[in-house]
């Protein structure tokens, strides 16, 4: 078998370096998912199931990227064509999954205001212990009151709407929706960075795999 030339050694180094970057990005993605999960878990009674599942899905994707990146590193170090192609295949599957997730996120981003409005209004009209506790957390955390303002309570303002004797005047719909959108943007930025490095890794891994295959058959 011929020895890999300078160009192939360069490709091998690129695959290894890109996978180290993907490993680090996956850790950031896992951290971002955990952060969002902690934040969202406080208000899960007022969230659609898609939003409740999103942080867990982000963490799972991060773990999968971590494992796949490790496979890519091993394939590059061992100059194993099969491992490199398996690595590229898994990355392609991940990219497709991430694209689907991005489409779902965009669709639900446009529906956040309507969804939160419906859920919060329903919570005020048909309260129960869990929903009331969630609304209290939202009102205390975001210094807001009701859906659009304290008038939603028709004079029976709860203690969570007050700081001392002062009643919060801002409604919770706008601030809570902004909170969800902010966290969505954070995760989207991290995911976009990961996708960029994944795409580069796929191209370079396929090139390296093909060249190694050619060298092994010289």
Swiss-Prot record:
The main place the protein resides is membrane
- Extracellular compartment segments: 37-55, 109-183
Q: How does the record classify its membrane topology?
A: Multi-pass membrane protein
Its keywords, alphabetically, are:
Membrane, Transmembrane, Transmembrane helix
Chain ranges passing through the membrane: 13-36, 56-71, 83-108, 184-205
The organism's superkingdom is given as Eukaryota
UniProt topological domain (Cytoplasmic) ranges:
1-12, 72-82, 206-218
Short name of any one Pfam family annotated for the protein: Tetraspanin
Family of the protein in this entry: Belongs to the tetraspanin (TM4SF) family.
Record's PANTHER family? TETRASPANIN (PTHR19282:SF544)
Protein name (record): 23 kDa integral membrane protein
Task: State the organism of origin.
Answer: Schistosoma japonicum (Blood fluke)
Tell me the lineage of the source organism: Eukaryota, Metazoa, Spiralia, Lophotrochozoa, Platyhelminthes
């Amino acid at each position: 078998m011929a020895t890999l030339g300078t160009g192939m050694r360069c490709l091998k180094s690129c695959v290894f370096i890109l996978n180290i970057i993907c490993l680090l990005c996956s850790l950031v993605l896992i951290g971002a998912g955990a952060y969002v999960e902690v934040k969202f878990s406080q208000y899960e009674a007022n969230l659609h199931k898609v939003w409740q599942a999103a942080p867990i899905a982000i963490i799972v994707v991060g773990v999968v990227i971590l494992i796949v990146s490790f496979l890519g590193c091993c394939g590059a170090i061992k100059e194993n064509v099969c491992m490199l192609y398996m690595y590229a295949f898994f990355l392609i599957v991940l990219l497709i999954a991430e694209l689907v997730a991005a489409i779902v996120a965009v669709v639900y981003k446009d529906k956040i205001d309507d969804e939160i409005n419906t859920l919060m209004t329903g919570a005020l009209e048909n309260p129960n212990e869990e929903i009331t506790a969630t609304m209290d957390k939202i009102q205390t955390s975001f210094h807001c009151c009701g859906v659009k303002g304290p008038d939603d309570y028709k004079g029976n303002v709860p203690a969570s709407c007050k700081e001392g004797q002062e009643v919060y005047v801002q409604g919770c719909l706008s601030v809570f929706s902004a909170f969800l959108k902010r966290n969505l943007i954070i995760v989207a930025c991290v995911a976009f960075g990961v996708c960029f490095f994944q795409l580069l890794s796929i191209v370079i891994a396929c090139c390296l795999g093909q060249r190694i295959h050619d060298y092994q058959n010289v």
